[in-house]
């Protein structure tokens, strides 16, 4: 791209995918290659790299101007930037005896405005989408729109995603919806046993629920961002799964399967266990294939843009430590949860403690600040009014077994 810009090469169109994951700095170069630009992405999924770090710096209440000036004047940005930005004048002002409280106050206000613009430019795609949405509301000419029709997933899954993240705006493609609602088209089944009664549900979401950590007498299974009990459940479920190609020779297309977890340590542990149990070889013999790459388990971040016929999720977190962000961590990151919950086509099996999420969602601190968590729990927890109305999730309680 650098060479194209240097040689003043122009195209009729520039099309950029995954624009929501790119920072404004990364988008500038391709934007310069044409006067017509199409940006495709989802700002409600994974953000640009280091967005959280950048925002934490820009949102600080106090500013150390000496560090700011030194970093730009003497750091890797040195050249003409100091002169053309006016930082040389700011440096002289900071070292003079004329710096009074009014000047500092005015300086702070100016810097805050600059930082606000910097945040906007760093998360450029998000800013453009939100601007477009405001224009649509005001019936003004808009520069963008939401792609509302979804073709990928079971309508139960899309209902959850649409309600949690997209203001109930997603629409299921009719033929796709009918295909997923017809359980005979699902290309896999499970051999039932006492571990997972009624696991062959027609629901697009199945939750294998570990009991509430407040209600048992053994130590929590979560340890250092791993959860061995969840891993045992996943191993067992993969032993029981069968492809319908084994039962029907006409259907011999490999079924894509993937296990996801928010935490790298859990991913590493699961992949190690899969090697020990020869899980990949066994599922391949039964007509399944890994949806992406060589490892059956991946982190959520590494699977954005991916999809599989069946997704199994390991949530890991299983405690009631305070504060809430220490207890739930990743599970409170709505954008990453959006990615995790929207990868499955036919079915998503979630392994984790829904009781724990319900416990937290009933906590006043969560109700005040964690709307996403409360809403998701109410849609999925058995016996809640909303869950009974929606009927999108089949819940199977799993009793702890100390193997």
Which residue stretches match the model-derived regions?
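Helicase C-terminal subdomain and adjacent C-terminal extension
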Residues: 53-142, 320-403
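Conserved helicase/translocase P-loop NTPase motor core
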Residues: 1-12, 232-236
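Conserved P-loop NTPase nucleotide-binding/switch module
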Residues: 30, 34-66
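Conserved helicase/translocase motor-coupling segment
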Residues: 162, 168-272
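Conserved ATPase-coupling elements of RecA-like P-loop NTPase cores
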Residues: 2-5, 19-28, 48-51
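Catalytic acidic motif of RecA-like/P-loop NTPases
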Residues: 20-21, 44-45, 301
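Conserved helicase C-terminal RecA-like lobe
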Residues: 240-258, 265-342, 354-360
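SF2 helicase catalytic motif II
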Residues: 8-23, 38-39
């Amino acid at each position: 791209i650098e060479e194209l810009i240097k040689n003043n090469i122009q195209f009729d169109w520039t099309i950029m995918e995954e624009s929501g994951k790119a920072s404004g700095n990364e988008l500038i170069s391709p934007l310069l290659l044409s006067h017509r630009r199409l940006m495709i992405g989802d700002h409600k999924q994974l953000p640009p790299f280091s967005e959280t770090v950048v925002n934490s710096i820009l949102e600080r209440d106090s500013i150390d101007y000496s560090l700011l000036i030194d970093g730009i004047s003497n750091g890797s940005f040195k050249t003409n930037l100091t002169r053309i930005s006016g930082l040389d004048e700011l440096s002289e002002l900071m070292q003079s005896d004329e710096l009074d409280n009014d000047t500092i106050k005015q300086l702070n206000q100016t810097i805050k405005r600059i930082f606000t613009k910097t945040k906007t430019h760093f998360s450029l795609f998000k800013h453009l989408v939100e601007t477009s949405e405001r224009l649509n509301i005001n019936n003004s000419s808009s520069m963008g729109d939401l792609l509302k029709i979804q073709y990928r997933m079971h309508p139960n899954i899309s209902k959850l995603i649409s309600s949690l993240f997209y203001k109930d705006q997603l629409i299921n493609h009719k033929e796709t919806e009918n295909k997923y609602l017809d359980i005979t088209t699902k290309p896999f089944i499970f051999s039932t046993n006492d571990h997972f009664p009624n696991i062959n549900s027609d629901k697009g979401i199945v939750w294998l629920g570990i009991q509430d950590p407040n209600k048992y007498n053994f130590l929590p299974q979560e340890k250092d961002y791993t959860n061995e009990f969840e891993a045992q459940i996943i191993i067992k479920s993969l032993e029981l799964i069968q492809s319908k190609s084994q039962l029907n020779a006409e259907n011999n297309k490999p079924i894509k399967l993937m296990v996801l977890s928010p935490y790298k340590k859990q991913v590493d542990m699961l992949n190690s266990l899969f090697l020990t149990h020869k899980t990949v070889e066994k599922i391949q013999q039964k007509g399944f294939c890994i949806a992406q790459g060589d490892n059956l388990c991946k982190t959520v971040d590494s699977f954005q843009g991916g999809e599989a016929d069946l997704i199994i999720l390991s949530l890991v977190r299983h405690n009631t430590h305070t504060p809430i962000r220490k207890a739930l961590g990743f599970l409170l990151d709505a954008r990453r949860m959006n990615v995790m919950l929207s990868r499955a086509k036919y079915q998503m099996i979630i392994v984790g403690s829904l009781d724990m999420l319900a416990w937290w969602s009933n906590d006043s601190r969560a109700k005040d600040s964690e709307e996403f968590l409360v809403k998701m729990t109410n849609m999925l927890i058995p016996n809640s009014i909303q869950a009974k109305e929606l009927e999108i999730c089949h819940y199977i309680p799993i009793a702890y077994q100390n193997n």
